[in-house]
UniProtKB/Swiss-Prot annotation:
Post-translational events: Contains an active site 4-methylidene-imidazol-5-one (MIO), which is formed autocatalytically by cyclization and dehydration of residues Ala-Ser-Gly.
Positions bearing 2,3-didehydroalanine (Ser): 195
pH dependence: Optimum pH is 8.4-8.8.
A single GO BP: cinnamic acid biosynthetic process
Gene: PAL4
Keywords, comma-separated and alphabetical: Cytoplasm, Lyase, Phenylalanine catabolism, Phenylpropanoid metabolism
Protein name, as recorded: Phenylalanine ammonia-lyase 4
Annotated Gene3D superfamilies: Fumarase/aspartase (Central domain), Fumarase/aspartase (N-terminal domain), Phenylalanine ammonia-lyase 1, domain 3
Coiled-coil zones: none
Protein task: This is a key enzyme of plant metabolism catalyzing the first reaction in the biosynthesis from L-phenylalanine of a wide variety of natural products based on the phenylpropane skeleton.
Catalysed conversion reaction: L-phenylalanine = (E)-cinnamate + NH4(+)
Pfam families for the chain: Lyase_aromatic
Cellular localisation: Cytoplasm
Subunit details: Homotetramer.
Length: 707
């Protein structure tokens, strides 16, 4: 909605008085385009605050600090802020009765005082009711630094709109603290986000006023007193609060909405990652790509589903794995089910609604961080204070509860896909547990990781339970309904962290599967070559070099190799307890039984040559299998890795080359967790964003045409 601000009075000028059109307009375009915009804003060097244009990406950038984004205040906002501050002073001087200026607070607002400044100091004192635990070094009861920085940024943005009765100089001081990486210590718990985040925000006010119990953390993590913090930030002196200023600082939703902003920044990126990993899952599982066909999803109408399918379709379009899988399905259509299982086939239908929920929550929080959410509001143009309830953080609680449920659903899909990937009953020829070593009896691959994934998924599903239905009546039944916005944001932050753990484990497993497919292809080529050589030498050529009719058995024995999963026998390829040798023997016996007349002649008998065939194969095949493994380990495989011809390659390259991870085997000392840590830290630091978006750089925002 376009707004007109005349003399500090907002009026609707767009014909959209209820803001529904603006809300719908904000959802135009693809989710991926929105994520790209978010990332672009995250990487800007400066964030200019004016009150109405703050974005999720900007909040995440300032929250995570590191000197990357500096905060500037729009000078044009100064006049409106000053006008509301002066109105409060003039109102009090006239003797006008105003909530929180001349009255007590909440259920005790019947009390009156003319000591406006003292009242604000008392507000900050009694709200400093948080618990920090053993001391400044203990972080278990202290709000994380990024969350506090997000809260500071959002609160300044709100107050800049000029409806709160606070001096511009106080907002400048908070901005200096942000830009100098000085962060007040706020309690982790103690707010119900209605009437705003009173308790945690009071500690920011406490630092600004120099309360002796106030602490801050400096750029290097050092603990600072209020005096030390102000000196480092270049703020000359503590503030003596004027009437309404304490209330303006504490009576808002900035802590809950600030944390929600950083949470949703990550959640949106993880949602896109889940789409790309689902496509990679289809590649390594030799899936059938028709599950992404646009007509299927167009007929369902849901935009999230249509986009998820289109993204997966784009990744799979032209994929070398898909081309190879199509050949396999055509060669032996009965070798695998007609349809893939739900974790693959319905992944767009599953992910689509979750992405719609996360996107809607993102827009809801983006509106909240640009809202005026304290009480009372100062309307200078009408010369009045408006007593309302914008401090009620219900949009935060609802958005976070919904997002957490969506995050849990994404995690559930990852777990289902991961479970198929490590199970040799379902994974179309990959080894059990994705074991990459020579001896499966001494290599259990991702077995521990699968147990960990079950743990992550269980905790994530528990966290999906709502927070907002646990409201308790507070503050002498004045705050009898309250949003629990920050609590819900905190739980969603936990959920996002667990989804990062799951994404990490799953992505490393997908890269392991890619490498195993590469090894499988080279092994199969070597096995076919060895079997072909022995068949020619033993079965089709007589003692004098003459060809026998049994040469046709070569085609059949090679078909056995084609149809047998190479990892079902690769650790001991000539073992008669494994299917390869059993089936080769069976096919030769079948040939012998099919032609008794030929079998009567020892020169042409296939049956009499079975022993020689197996003996020669036992001499050649193990050497060939070992040769292929050595070449793979040395990076000299005859067949290149197919992943390089796929749009999912940037993710694989990032995990393998940039993070220096490798195929996990029982032969190496490196544990799975060591590799997972590398990827988890990269995801947490935002380093996965570029390779993820590189996978989709050629996508035009539309599905492949069905015409």
């Amino acid at each position: 909605m376009e707004l007109c601000n005349q003399n500090n009075h907002i009026t609707a000028v767009s014909g959209d008085p209820l803001n529904w059109n603006a809300t719908a307009e904000a959802l135009k375009g693809s989710h991926l385009d929105e994520v790209k915009r978010m990332v672009k804003e995250y990487r800007k060097e400066a964030v200019k605050l004016g009150g109405e244009t703050l974005t999720i990406g900007q909040v995440a950038a300032v929250a995570r600090g590191g000197g990357g984004s500096t905060v500037e205040l729009a000078e044009e906002a100064r006049a409106g802020v000053k006008a509301s501050s002066e109105w409060v002073m003039e109102s009090m001087n006239r003797g006008t009765d105003s909530y929180g200026v001349t009255t007590g607070f909440g259920a005790t607002s019947h009390r009156r005082t003319k000591q406006g400044g003292a009242l604000q100091n008392e507000l900050i004192r009694f709200l400093n009711a948080g618990i920090f635990g053993p001391g400044a070094g203990d972080t278990s009861h202290t709000l994380p630094k990024p969350t506090t920085r997000a809260a500071m940024l959002v609160r300044v943005n709100t107050l800049l709109q000029g409806y709160s009765g606070i001096r511009f100089e106080i907002l400048e001081a908070i901005t200096k603290l942000l830009n100098h990486e000085i962060t007040p210590c706020l309690p982790l718990r103690g707010t119900i986000t209605a009437s705003g985040d009173l308790v945690p925000l009071s500690y920011i006010a406490g630092l600004l006023t120099g309360r002796p119990n106030s602490k801050a953390v400096g750029p290097s993590g050092e603990t600072l007193t209020a005096s030390e913090a102000f000196k480092l930030a270049g703020v000359s002196s503590f503030f003596e609060l004027q009437p309404k200023e304490g209330l303006a600082l504490v009576n808002g939703t900035a802590v809950g909405s600030g944390l929600a902003s950083t949470v949703l920044f990550d959640a949106n990126i993880l949602a896109v990652l889940s789409e790309v990993m689902s496509a990679m899952f289809a590649e390594v599982m030799q899936g059938k790509p028709e599950f992404t066909d646009h007509l299927t999803h167009k007929l369902k109408h849901h935009p999230g589903q249509i986009e998820a399918a289109a993204i997966m379709e784009h990744i799979l379009d032209g994929s070398s794995y898909v081309k190879e899988a199509q050949l396999l399905h055509e060669m032996d259509p009965l070798q695998k089910p007609k349809q893939d299982r739900y974790a693959l086939r319905t992944s767009p239908q599953w992910l689509g609604p979750q992405i719609e929920v996360i996107r809607a929550a993102t827009k809801m929080i983006e509106r909240e961080i640009n809202s005026v959410n304290d009480n009372p509001l100062i309307d200078v143009s009408r010369n009045k204070a408006l007593h309302g309830g914008n401090f009620q953080g219900t949009p935060i609680g609802v958005a976070m509860d919904n997002s957490r449920l969506a995050i849990a659903s994404i995690g559930k899909l990852m777990f289902a896909q991961f479970s198929e990937l490590v199970n040799d009953f379902y994974n179309n020829g990959l080894p059990s547990n994705l074991s990459g070593g020579r001896n499966p009896s001494l290599d259990y691959g991702f077995k521990g990781a699968e147990i960990a994934m079950a743990s992550y998924c269980s905790e994530l599903q528990f966290l999906a339970n709502p927070v907002t239905n646990h409201v308790q009546s507070a503050e002498q039944h004045n705050q009898d309904v309250n949003s629990l916005g920050l609590i819900s944001s905190r739980k969603t932050a936990e959920a996002v962290d667990i989804l990062k753990l799951m994404s990490t484990t799953y992505l490393v497993a997908l890269c392991q599967a890619v490498d195993l497919r590469h090894l499988e292809e080279n092994l199969k080529k070597a096995v076919k070559s060895a079997v072909s050589q022995v068949a020619k030498r033993v079965l089709t050529v007589g003692a004098n070099g003459e060809l026998h009719p049994s040469r046709f058995t070569e085609r059949d024995v090679l078909q056995v190799v084609d149809r047998e999963y190479v990892f079902s026998y690769a650790d001991d390829p000539c073992s008669l307890t494994y299917p390869l040798m059993q089936k080769l023997r069976h096919i030769l016996v079948d040939h012998a039984l099919a032609d008794p007349e030929r079998e009567a002649n020892s020169a042409t008998s296939v049956f009499h040559k079975i022993g020689a065939f197996e003996a020669e194969l036992k001499l050649l095949l193990p050497k060939e299998v070992e040769r292929v493994r050595v070449e793979y380990e040395e990076g000299t495989s005859a067949i290149a890795n197919r992943i390089k011809e796929c749009r999912s390659y940037p993710l694989y390259r990032f995990v393998r080359d940039e993070l220096n991870t490798e195929l996990l085997t029982g032969e190496n000392v490196r544990s799975p967790g060591e590799e997972f840590d590398k990827v988890f830290l990269a995801i947490s630091d935002g380093k996965l964003i570029d390779p993820l978006l590189e996978c989709l750089k050629e996508w035009n925002g539309a599905p492949v045409s069905i015409c």
